[in-house]
């Protein structure tokens, strides 16, 4: 690996950012709103309404998973556009910045702008990354940016920035803590001289502590510190039930391929390539070289994240944490393999690879585009029209109608899977029994549920007071209050069966280059 190039924003970097913008524009911003994205969109809307994270909706991710979409919604309201569209545009800009950061890190590693171009275009081939760039919001979009910012800072020995990036990544998605802390500690331990190591360690830890302290202070000021501690720490440490790669090791390609398609090979191979590059760099390590140390540190980070994923891996979205590493590893290996060529041939190979990756990314972006958002919105409003002007909606794990109609959930708790039921029962005053009594008193007109069969505490209420309209096993199940007329129930059922809110749009795999 080579010494870093000058840090100025060069023309190739601008080209990478423009390419990313083009790929995201091809995908569009009018795609369907899925359940997971709706959770963060609803959280963002509540933040824009002035409700602190975890108070509007309790979930397990970090507060930035609420705050970043909230900033988007606020900007949208200022300029007079739709909340969700504004959130998606903001997250697309964050994704463009992530692609640009991947370019910078790979450029520094390899001393080659074309290698950086390979890293950026590789990121654009990952279907899950592109999907949530414009069909979110999702917390892992912000997490990817923070990971790359931290890796860039480690490679430049900018320890304050690295500490800030680590803290922000963790405050977005807690699982990002492990690879970044391990990468930073490895880089710090490889610094020449104890004094420089201790000084850099102090700056790194100090920056992270300051960011964390400011976060805690902010929640204390708005009276939501307990809610923060519950959502960020308590539910994860004491209640969350997770599967890991150990339970599904042989099924990883099957899990990833429907979303990542042919780029599953790059996702897995590129991540492992980071480890190989780190091992090669460590053999003759120049500890005075920030980029060489950065390569070794990044490989250690991949191993740390792999170790975490062995016990906590819920599906293809959790693979997004490997996207930055896979892009860097792919670029690094390709640059290494072309070193035997003369300079002109090497540049040609890297340029052709970048073009092929970009073409594949553009084709994949276009082929997975959909425009179901407006139909979803129309269905939500039509259901409300059928059920009356005073209709209220309760979400149990399915906040799409709340987001699309800009409604408040009557209760803070919406998530009840993977240990959350036990958490609510233990921590909510009166537990689940009191919650059911509250719902009987509120009597929401419409209930949107993710998996009613798994919610034993809810089933008696649904059976006694509600009529099932239908829905999809992969998305929302709809129930309406039994006081509606037969005609209104019939019309509502027709809307549910005809509309896109009952459909979870599959993410088809990407075509090859």
Which stretches of residues belong to each language-model region?
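Short periplasmic/luminal acceptor-recognition loop of GT-C membrane glycosyltransferases, typified by
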Residues: 162, 369-425, 432-456
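Transmembrane-helix motifs of polytopic, lipid-linked glycan transferases
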Residues: 89-110, 125
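Hydrophobic/aromatic-rich transmembrane helices and adjacent perimembrane loops
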Residues: 306-344
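Short acidic/glycine- and proline-prone juxtamembrane loop motifs at membrane-interface regions
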Residues: 132-140
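Membrane-interface transmembrane helices that cradle and orient dolichyl/undecaprenyl
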Residues: 147-161, 273-288, 334-337
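Membrane-interface helix-loop-helix junctions at transmembrane boundaries of multi-pass membrane enzymes
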Residues: 4-9, 107-109, 192-205, 272-300, ...
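Membrane-interface alpha helices of multi-pass inner-membrane proteins
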Residues: 22, 120, 147-153, 159-186, ...
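Extracytoplasmic catalytic/substrate-binding loops of multi-pass membrane glycan-assembly enzymes
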Residues: 29-43, 53-72, 78-85, 223, ...
